[in-house]
Amino acid sequence: MELPERIKSTSEYRFVDKGNVKLSKLMKSVRMNQIKVRDKNLFEDNIILRGDLALISCEKCVILCENAIIHPSLNNINAPYEYRPLHIGKYTYIGKNSIISSLKIGEYVYIGENCILSDRTKVENNVKVMDNTYVPSDMELVEYGIYEGYPAKLIGHLDNQNSKYMEFFCNDYFDKLVIKKK
């Protein structure tokens, strides 16, 4: 299924100087200097990035959809106000209304809509988290796994072509957002 083209105006989106990055003017970020982005990142409306807590780094072609909340994970229960940096790997898609508080999100990862990834979770490369899934604290999602449920359970495995699919999907999603002057 091909994604439809979405047309937005320059009054709604802006480009970042470094690379080809599209940021919604409605996104909310705290301490943007603590948020590192690479080429072809797309941050949609009303997302919240908590760069005031610890460093957040997004590799190439990370898609953050509407109303997603991304913040670094608490270090551990004994140090309640210490946060760990969050690294999001290349070609990763995070769906609408998802809340992410992980230690790591690997490459070629798909996280569906309305998902919650709790503190200190680790998502390895090539993982799919289905819509409406809750991943409890300290859980590690293994490579090529498909997870679903409340709490998340392994329900299947991705094939070894997932990285090619996610690369195509994320590039297509990014390219289909066309920003035009009014």
Language-model-detected regions and their locations in the chain:
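Glycine-rich hexapeptide-repeat left-handed beta-helix
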Residues: 2-14, 58-60, 66-67, 72-86, ...
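Right-handed parallel beta-helix/beta-solenoid
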Residues: 30-33, 50-55, 81
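Glycine/small-residue-rich loop that forms an oxyanion/phosphate-binding "nest" at active or ligand-binding sites
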Residues: 89
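Extended, small-residue-rich solenoid/repeat segments and analogous flexible loops
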Residues: 1-48
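Short, conserved beta-strand segments within well-ordered enzyme catalytic domains
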Residues: 36, 42, 48-50, 57, ...
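Short HxH-centered metal-ligating active-site micro-motif
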Residues: 93
